[in-house]
């Protein structure tokens, strides 16, 4: 998630590109993140087969003065990265916690990017549920 935050400028880019060019640039941008992520999961899965991967949540960007213009485009980028998460989980036989189903209301966020104590409580409850099921 934080790696994606570092690339928000990509979404704010005012250069006119075709849809194909935008998608190609997004894939290129995500490639090193994907490689690092898969390497980390591979190494961890060799040490402990019980891993829980988490998707990236979308944030509460709509209506925020800094992020509002990229709120919907950021969902597409998050979805592209979450595809990497699900693909990696499938490859290494790990579970996935879908954070987009946890952080669903404005109250779940302390600010546009970070979870609030309410969101954090929901998150921790889901992790505990996963641990107790193992």
Whereabouts are the PLM-identified features?
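Alpha-helical cap/lid subdomain in secreted, periplasmic
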Residues: 1-117, 121-132
């Amino acid at each position: 998630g934080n790696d994606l935050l570092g690339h928000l400028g990509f979404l704010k880019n005012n250069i006119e590109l075709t849809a194909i060019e935008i998608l190609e640039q997004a894939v290129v941008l995500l490639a090193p993140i994907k490689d690092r992520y898969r390497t980390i999961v591979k190494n961890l899965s060799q040490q402990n087969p019980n891993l829980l991967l988490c998707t990236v949540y979308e944030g509460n960007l709509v209506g925020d003065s800094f992020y509002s213009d990229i709120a919907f485009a950021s969902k597409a980028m998050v979805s592209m990265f979450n595809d990497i998460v699900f693909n990696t989980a499938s490859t290494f036989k790990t579970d996935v916690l879908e954070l987009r189903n946890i952080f669903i209301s404005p109250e779940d966020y302390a600010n546009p990017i970070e979870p609030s104590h309410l969101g954090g409580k929901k998150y921790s409850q889901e992790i505990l549920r996963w641990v107790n099921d193992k």
